[in-house]
Amino acid sequence: EIGVRLVGSEMCIRDRYKPDFAVVAVKKDAICDVSMEWLDRGITVLSETPAALDMDSLNKLYSYYKCGKKQVVAEQYREYPNIKASLKLINEGIIGDVSCANVSLAHEYHGISLIRAFLGVKPGEKYVVSAKTYEFPTTQTLTRYDKFTDGRIAGKKRCVATFEFESGKVAWYDFDSEQYRSPIRKNTLKVQGVRGELIDECVYYLDENNDCLL
């Protein structure tokens, strides 16, 4: 009806249409297994994050890479316009060499991806992490499915973690379970460099005369 070809099996796709790559768009606990099924068929895979949920699964995926098979994992947060603009300023050196960042923008693997981007962490760089999850009473407002206006209060989790990288750079991850949708829990970002800092959408830095600019 709309010109999209449908098939009844993965084997039919491979043998009849010989795709350039397969897009894996399934629940996150199935991404790894489905990706490996297509890699086993010799098909390049494009998947979203997370590629896997544990180290054993990640190591299995890495073994495919070492054999020359390819999986591309799409991470979208670095491409958000405001984040992309912030990264551009930092990479241009406006605040100098970056030493630390406080990232409260996105959960788990998305947040860690942003930490690596803002600090310029090298692939494979070792780090030490310590973390703790707290629970605080919070007035409920919006969820993915509902809107609450009766003032109900529930315990909501907040995870705080410190990442210390072997380069000496440090990041603090801070994320509240209500943060994506609640109007009373807002995102925030702070990145410090030797010549200034970026806080949300403001940059404080020194010019060539070492005068402070905003």
Question: Where do the model's predicted regions map?
Answer:
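Glycine-rich phosphate-binding loop signature in dinucleotide/nucleotide-binding domains
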Residues: D15-K18, I94-I95
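Rossmann-like dinucleotide-binding domain that binds NAD(P)(H)
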Residues: D97-K186
